[in-house]
Design a protein with these regions (language model features):
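N-terminal ligand-binding/catalytic initiation module
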Residues: 1-141
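Predominant activation on well-ordered alpha-helical scaffold segments within soluble catalytic domains
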Residues: 55-62, 93-104, 124-127, 152-160, ...
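Flexible, glycine/charged-enriched surface loops at secondary-structure junctions
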Residues: 69-74, 109-114, 168-175, 223, ...
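Hydrophobic beta-strand scaffold residues
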Residues: 110, 199, 220, 279-280, ...
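Glycine-rich phosphate/diphosphate-binding loop of Rossmann-like nucleotide-binding domains
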Residues: 146-233
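Adenosine-phosphate binding glycine-rich loop
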Residues: 163, 254-350
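Rossmann-like adenosine-cofactor binding region
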Residues: 206-286
Length: 350
């Protein structure tokens, strides 16, 4: 395998493969860009079928983090870590300590945090061996902790902005289909329900869907039919590549706005959404609430009010993207990519 010729290799600055025989750790850390600051992005633990697929995910996710941090106006670059393993069966404190040593060896070039398959508890183990970690448990009133609810808040505000732009109205009485009901999807459903939204939900873990049904009165639908449900907004909050040439024709919603990373299977899928008249909120713009929280925690000296003020800029950025895309007759994803690259390039010149 030639790493430098892989389709998802995008001039990444560094890719680190880590293995610890004693704990069974197999991890990849990808640093896409440090033009704006140290690379920051979460650590995902997933049972990848192969190391090639894990590498592809790390490359794509780290690039997305560069764009996310740039668009959120953070002084952070983009990186991501993936641990190959079943998060429900293979976690041990020693494994995350070994991962922490791998992070520490980079000397601050990469700052980690929790992501899919990892938690604040796991990050506490990492923090025992390296200072280059965020998303840690904090005392009441301190900035930090699980970034999921902050991601959900940003997505909620982004959905409001997309609905105003596309439909010219508020949320009450609309139907939102939410895919994935974990650490972001569930709190997002709470925020939507409080605004009078009708919820249709799906998750591969039936117990999570049932929990949301009992708490919020959501309609539970099979995972494989959610795209085809009558809904005003589709909010993907699980894994990526959900929007493709095969899935887009099945969509019934007029707006796509969710928390999942890398929602487009291919860059060209943004064009397909535009042709279908579907407004797409670029994932790394709408889901930046979590990394904003992580950044404020890591830098220190911040407040919850400052974090919320930064997250409340997300709808403004989305609206600017929507307006520019409409004026230029280009996909919102293309416009967002260009804006992110421009900020990264400016950082390299500085």
């Amino acid at each position: 395998m030639d790493l430098f010729s892989l389709p998802d290799f995008d001039g990444h600055e560094q890719v680190v493969f880590g293995h610890d025989r004693a704990t069974g750790l197999r991890a990849i850390i990808a640093i896409h860009s440090s033009a704006l600051g140290p690379a920051a992005g979460g650590c995902r633990m997933w049972a990848y079928p192969s190391s090639d697929e894990a590498l592809t995910d790390a490359l794509r996710l780290s690039r997305g983090m560069s764009y996310k941090n740039a668009m959120a106006e953070l002084d952070l670059g983009g990186g991501k870590a993936v641990i190959i393993g079943d998060a429900r069966a293979h976690k041990t404190p020693a494994l995350f300590q070994a991962f922490g040593r791998l992070v520490d060896a980079l000397g601050g070039r990469y700052i980690t945090a929790e992501d899919v398959g990892t938690s604040t508890t796991d990050m506490e183990q990492v923090a025992g061996v390296t200072p280059y970690v965020s998303g840690l448990k904090r005392a009441s009133g301190e900035v930090g902790g699980d970034p999921g609810p902050k991601t959900a808040l940003g997505v909620f505000l982004g959905i409001q902005a997309a609905v105003r732009f596309q439909l010219g109205r508020g949320l009450e009485g609309l139907t939102v289909a939410v895919q994935g009901l974990g650490g972001v999807g569930h709190p997002l459903c709470r925020l939507l329900a409080a605004e009078g939204v009708r919820l249709k939900v799906a998750d591969a873990r039936a117990e999570l869907a049932e929990r949301v049904r009992e708490e919020l009165g959501a309609a539970v639908v099979p995972v494989d039919t959610l795209l085809e449900q009558d809904a005003d907004v589709f909010a993907p909050c699980a894994l990526g590549a959900v929007l493709s040439a095969q899935s887009i024709p099945r969509l019934r919603a007029r707006i796509i706005a969710g928390a999942a990373n890398n929602q487009l299977a291919r860059e060209s899928d943004g064009e397909l959404l535009m042709q279908a008249g579907i407004l797409y909120a670029p994932d790394y713009v709408i889901n930046a609430g979590g990394i904003i929280n992580v950044a404020h925690e890591y830098r220190g000296g911040s407040t919850e009010a400052a974090v919320h003020a930064a997250i409340k800029k997300i709808p403004e950025r989305l609206t600017a993207i929507f307006e520019r895309a409409r004026q230029e007759s280009r996909p919102t994803s293309t416009v967002a990519d260009q804006m992110a690259r421009e900020r990264l390039q400016a950082g390299r010149r500085a």
